[in-house]
Amino acid sequence: ALTADSTMVGYVRSLKIKNLKNCGTFTIPTELAEENENYARNPKSSDWTLADSYDSFSDCIEKEIQIHHKGSDPVRLSNIYKPLFVLPQKSKAWSTTPTQPVSIEEANKNHETYLEISMKLIDDGEYLFGSETEYETVYLPFNTIHMDSYHHIEGWQPGYRYVYRIYFGGGYDAEGYLIRKGTTKGTTIDTTVEEWQDE
């Protein structure tokens, strides 16, 4: 994570991904792998049949993490050696926008995915989120959909690691309204997809 501007500094206490599917049925592949017919092929998303059951997933942030601006090295909000494992899936991002707010209550009803972050964000000495003594809960639309190298839209796939880089500069409240307080910077999320490698 980084802040969106050099005048900003942030403090993150917790992060949750909300409204992801959390259970289903997995069919063990029986087809043989093309490259080695002594083994079954690797699992695919189509081997999963997901149930309509949704949950929150928390990344384990054990203490306050300070984040700095874009020119700095990114700060990890999660432990690379303790990745968060979730089921392969496509999700629908929380549909709130700066001009058409949608509440968190509606997002939960419609199973729309978002990040719930407890944090402070300071811009040039002024608190945009939180205060000296308290964290504020901020929400960001989030989805599991990305573009693959062939420009196909897909969700999370088995056998890959998905790394998200968040540039904090804004966020939404629980009613879906943009929290700005004087800043014109927004928050963006970049995705990197890597083949899974055992550490």
Label every model-predicted segment.
Residues A1-E199:
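Extracytoplasmic cysteine-anchoring/structural motifs
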